[in-house]
Amino acid sequence: MPENTAIASIFTAIVCFKFIILTLEAKEKSNLIRPEFKHPSPEQAAGILNRSFFWWFNPLLLTGSKQRLAVDDLFFNDDGLTFDAWRDIITRRWAKADISKPHALLKVMLATFKGLLLAGILPRLCLTGPETTTSNKVAYGLIAAYAIVYIGIAVMSTMSQHKNYRTIVAIRGSAVSLIYQHTLRLTSSSTSTSSSLTLINNDVERMGHGMREVHEIWASLIEIALSLWLLEVRLGVSVVAAVFVIIGNICTLLGCVFGFVKMGLLLGDRQKVWLEAIEKRTSSTIATLGSIRGIKSTGATDIVQRITTRLRLDEIRISLKYRELLVGIVTLSYVSTTMAPVFAFATYSIISNSRGTTPLLAASAYTSLTIFSLLGQAVSKWISSSVDIITTIACLERVRQYLATNLRVDPRTIESYIKPIDSSNSPRLRNSDISQTEMLDMGSVDQSQYHPNSVGEVLREVPLAKMMITIRDCSACWSKGSEMAISEINLTILKGSLAMVIGPIGSGKSTLLKVILGEMPHTTGTVIVGRSEAAFCGQSPWLTNVSVRNNIIGVSYLDANWYNTVVNACALDRDFEQLPDGDNTVIGSKGVLLSGGQKSRLALARALYARNDLVILDDVFSGLDAKTEQRVFESVLGSHGILRQGGTTTVLATNSVRNISLADHIVVMGSDGKITDQGTYQNLVFASSYLESLGTRQKTLNISDSEKSKDDTVSGLAVASAMHQPVDSDNRGDKDLTIYKYYIDTVGWVTWWVFVLLCSGFVFGLVFPQIWIQFWTEANARQANYRLAYYLSLYALWPLMAIVIFLGACAWLMIRMVSKAAIQFHGILLNSALSAPLVYFSTTDSGEVSNRFTQDLNLIDMELPTALIGTTVTFLSCIAQIGVIIYGSSYVAAAIPALIVFLYYIQLFYLRTSRQLRLLELEAKAPLLSHFMESIHGLVTIRAFGWTEKFTHQNHDLLERSQRPFYLLYCAQRWLNLTLELAVAFLAIILVSIALTTRESSGAKIGVALLSIVGFGLNLKTLVYTWTSLEIAMGAVSRIRHFAINTSSEDLPGEDRTLPPDWPHEGVIRFQSVSAAYSPTSHPVLNDLSFTVKAGTKVAICGRTGSGKSSTLAALLRLIDLRSGAITIDGIDISTVVRQDLRSKLITLPQEPFYYHASIRDNLDVRGQFSTEELLDILEVVGMREVIDKKGGLDAMANADVLSHGQSQLLCLARAILRPNKILILDEATSSVDKKTEEKMVDIIREKFQDRTVISVAHNLNTIMDYDEVIVLEAGRIIEQGKPLALALEPSFFASLLKAADGESEDALEEETISNIASPRSR
């Protein structure tokens, strides 16, 4: 006895000591952390009990239940989840990996995150083990044991999942960062917005979804082995039959899924094809959203809708093959779980009947069924987790393939001091000795010795420090085997000089600039530059969806004095005065409502603000009227311009030769991609046939200081102020029933109820056998194996029926419901987007709209179906099992209402926060996607400026911001999972207590109840898993619903008049006192316009930049609404006509060309009305047949990357010629082409549209001198109107504009403007 006392004392002391240690460990130590190391994450500072029971998460739930959450209200993620913690490790491992080998990324991820991944093994292992029995003589001990087991299961299950989700968050952040960093290093020709966005929205998200049950791969196998061992103990040899059923089904499954060769071969291949179809549709949609103004202007919304819908239908058709296989896999997973007990009990009963041994009784039956339930869950989890892992591996492989694509290698040589070209290497070059200053006067050069591709005539032993760019014998093409874009280029540009590159369209001007920037590899020769960085402005200005000021300063800091200098130099000061928020006004995605000139000047201002030593400009003045162009040119590139004063080297590719005499060096490109002439203006003005053909012998306009203070006014920019609202800002109060009803309305109520009935039949087939076993075992207790065939056959019938019904439910959902929902929701989105007013796209972030078409549709297509059937089946199963529990023990019924009330308030409390978190996750992800798209569109600009590292940091900040709601949503789900499992533990303890302390039910009924408790616990756990997935997917439905509701349509009530097929018959256009604005709250852009365009006449609208020219056409096309007045065409008020119908009856050639996502043939003739010969003839007319033949002919895909801007515009002109309508609208259609191409387009329009009404906005006034009438606008008003020649010969405002276009100064312009506004003239 003393020994026992001593042992007991030691044991007690050890327990107390452990308790003290546990208490100290559980005590939070945040108050002990030094201030410099304090972290805002409460989880990181929480103790072990706090983490185990998620107490640290309660404050956020309380806050979310009381108020509306914002991202800034959320906890920060702890250090272990940030990409900073893993950047060096994963970057180093990825650099060392053989990225060309399959699954290289998988290996890198496993090696990097093995610690996080392994952290979930121990708690998961605690859930796995054989059940042990406790003496039923100690009732209270058994009750305590049940409490410990069930609470332990709840805590360990939640902890295991939480550890796993931390791994998912870390991998998600790393994958997105790797994709972005790789994208910034790709060649400009290989970057695809759709590819990278598909990876982020689809593959990365599916990777996370597939990893949620990753530990079930190994844990389920252990549970299967343990369950089979326990069954063998209970049922003996009869368990072999069940084993054969399970093994047979697994083998069948493996045969279907793994293609008998490799795991995931069939499923992975089908998924890959499906994802490629998604990428194709996504690419078309993003291109559509980016060209929305041109699409609306040309009345092409119905064509775009038809093309995009066809891509969506193709995607759905392809996905059916994947879904069919998935239906088979899921059904097979249920075969083993439902049929295994049948075969086991049948074998046991048959052996018992033949040998006369103990029949199947309640104790062995319900114990075995409990084990079978656990076995079935283990088999199902192993199968589903295997499919998920296959999906994850396939997605990782797609990411690896993207990361393995060839990176851009800068082919240039960067040297601070550039050696001059050695004349011995080129017989064309001979040495001379002139300075930079002497280059400006080359009149004495002997033209007979001049060679077009020689720099020796203008450079003789130039000092090394004075050279900025040297190109030697360079030839370049966009891809291997393709035609040379430029050939045999020899060129040197000195520091501080201005070089202009001119030539016809397609001659390689832009290509030469790309070579200088290192964006295009050269096949031969060398390119040497004095700086790796350059301020670059592309032909299509790149703007981001931030304020005007932030677009100008980029990633630099604000220098107020320099900023104001740049703004004034680019003539933006007057624009700022018209903005409601000044230069803090957000301009919208791609500056959708800005005129071309305003976009160009913003981009130019950004280049100037950067203060780089090298500036490269690609036709930045093309969208400006002559007066504005001259003012900006003088301020920037004139003798006193800020680039000249700063000694900046500038290379300007241009189609405008108005100021070419100011260039220090001129490069003339030929149509064959070679330099045909180069030298100073004085050299070439007589020697260059091309330069002479352009008529460049002209004076340069000088702008007086008084004129510089007055310039253009703003047009549509003023609308992008306070209207900028996130598309999801108001939908956090959605009730779930409203969302579910909306989904059911979409798929159809009949379709829905068929699905519910099938699921109910399946649940009945699963649950009723538990009660049937009671009848069977009670009959056996009365008489051994009584009516064995009867009980056994019916027992087998229910599972067979359940399997057949489940197959029907899956097929009904996956093939019918999903396809219908996919078509309907895409149609809702597309209709809403295409019918939205143009102003919507300037006030809404492009990432938010793109998110609807990418992530939201993907959630509905991929996540929602499996979550829906899982939630429906498990919810019905829970209800059925509660009924069975009550049937087994009537006393438990008293606890059910309390449990229901508890669950109701828990879900109410939970949903208030989780609903906000799921929407915040999407809201926080939208800027990340927008930044991603903007980075891809501005890739060349970002790299040229040297902003790659800073944009990577911006991406990192946006990613970390989006990770916060993403991770906390997972935490909220784990909190709910823990709470519900504790509720199940409570119910189980009550049932066990009743069973051990009362005798109100039979053993069989108690067995039914205990079995149902186990099933209820398993199903409740599954319900949490599927319901949280369904909750996220239904969030996508909610966002689509709100997008459709809150996106107003441009079509207004009363706009329902139908037009005859051949309308307009004559083409008479009449403006009657028209005033218009881009939005009800913005400044009017048109004021009291009245004029008439007679049938068959040609009328030009001109004026300075921002005077209202494009807005006049926008009013005619119903892109903006009238505040007063009316516009009629052939006597019909266009405000009564459906807008799309109106636009489709007019021919519009916008400033920015766009393509449909289709072949060249379909782009020219989308309705299939013309033969191949007719299409080729039209291409011949516009001079594009040879170009198109080289690109692959009419059946090649239209691609803006392989055609120059001018070539694209000629293709759009060919499309316009094929249309028979009576009215042609030209919106600065020739502003971005060279003079020869412009003259060609003018001649084609004059010939092909001679009997039609033409209304044209033009900056080059020389192209409209033969028009019947010209209307001059200023500040949205008509100040002059008459015949161009008549106005040109008189002291008119038009004459002053014409003189400015011809390079002559007109000092009285401003006074005349004021005079004309006060009293407009008409001639």
Curated annotation (Swiss-Prot):
Its main location: membrane. Gene3D superfamilies: ABC transporter type 1, transmembrane domain, P-loop containing nucleotide triphosphate hydrolases. GO terms for molecular function: ABC-type transporter activity; ATP binding; ATP hydrolysis activity. It is found in: Cell membrane. Residues 471-697, 1069-1300 form the ABC transporter domain. Residues 142-380, 752-1031 form the ABC transmembrane type-1 domain. The chain crosses the membrane at residues 6-26, 102-122, 138-158, 217-237, 240-260, 325-345, 359-379, 748-768, 795-815, 821-841, 859-879, 891-910, 976-996, 1006-1026. The keyword Nucleotidyltransferase does not apply. 3-isopropylmalate dehydratase large subunit; part of the gene cluster that mediates the biosynthesis of pneumocandins, lipohexapeptides of the echinocandin family that prevent fungal cell wall formation by non-competitive inhibition of beta-1,3-glucan synthase. Possibly secretes antifungal pneumocandins, thus avoiding of intracellular accumulation and ameliorating the toxicity to the producing cells. This is ABC transporter gloK. It comes from Glarea lozoyensis (strain ATCC 20868 / MF5171).
